[in-house]
Amino acid sequence: MTIALGKYTKDEKDLFDIMDDWLRRDRFVFVGWSGLLLFPCAYFALGGWFTGTTFVTSWYTHGLASSYLEGCNFLTAAVSTPANSLAHSLLLLWGPEAQGDFTRWCQLGGLWTFVALHGAFALIGFMLRQFELARSVQLRPYNAIAFSGPIAVFVSVFLIYPLGQSGWFFAPSFGVAAIFRFILFFQGFHNWTLNPFHMMGVAGVLGAALLCAIHGATVENTLFEDGDGANTFRAFNPTQAEETYSMVTANRFWSQIFGVAFSNKRWLHFFMLFVPVTGLWMSALGVVGLALNLRAYDFVSQEIRAAEDPEFETFYTKNILLNEGIRAWMAAQDQPHENLIFPEEVLPRGNAL
């Protein structure tokens, strides 16, 4: 019995092969299959944001001016979240709320869901683009894995958190000052800075910045001289076989500074990947917890003692009072639809005031 082994080849290309050839062709800007998701979604997300910040008011959703047309600048303009009464509606243009009326759709906050959902899929498309290109040039996919950190933060903050609350209203609006408002809201209503997941996120992001600065400086300090251009970007050939900098010298330097140092480039660079990505993922997990209204650390014994002893105050009890102040002063401004009125006597006053 004879078995013939060989590679099967099709006589003519089908539609998939034709599309694959065109999408993955070597060109100045790579398209790829991931581009079918990335480019349209990124275009719509950015276009929706520019449209909203330029023309669309937030008067009907937040009682605010939020566009350049109304007098805002780059820092104060925003695409605002829909009203709380609309809960978690997708706010489709052709849905029951807007009924195909584009002006009404903008007034209701439809641009926010439009930007948020297209933005999320655009970020996912960008990660898939990194996977696709890495596979094409036979790289490992760690760039795409690293980009999962920002995606996790975006999805948790803009989508999962409001899904756990009463509506999209409690998500951040897309604007600089709007994000600042959201940060104050997170602190006042969730005591976010005392949340261990926030602490891990801060450690990851700031630790990554420190590692990046140290690594860049160390490489610059230990470059091998090679010709006249040793201190310029033309000093080395991108296809060179030899090292660009001296790992041995760098190891000796940091061993003297700290007593310990990385002795392996692979471990060093994996650590530089691990620190920020883990920090971002921990932050995202913390925000998912806040969506379920999980609490941060509570030091109840200090609160009880502060309530009983007029002379006792800690930075923790002071922060708790500040959070109460944020809630009392902010809720009425931030949620005008609730018609909240707080008498002067219920506003928090600490022992030190």
Curated annotation (Swiss-Prot):
This is Photosystem II D2 protein. PANTHER family: PHOTOSYSTEM II D2 PROTEIN (PTHR33149:SF57), PHOTOSYSTEM II PROTEIN D1 (PTHR33149). Photosystem II (PSII) is a light-driven water:plastoquinone oxidoreductase that uses light energy to abstract electrons from H(2)O, generating O(2) and a proton gradient subsequently used for ATP formation. It consists of a core antenna complex that captures photons, and an electron transfer chain that converts photonic excitation into a charge separation. The D1/D2 (PsbA/PsbD) reaction center heterodimer binds P680, the primary electron donor of PSII as well as several subsequent electron acceptors. D2 is needed for assembly of a stable PSII complex. Gene3D superfamilies: Photosystem II protein D1-like (1.20.85.10). Belongs to the reaction center PufL/M/PsbA/D family. GO terms for biological process: photosynthetic electron transport in photosystem II. NCBIfam families: psbD.
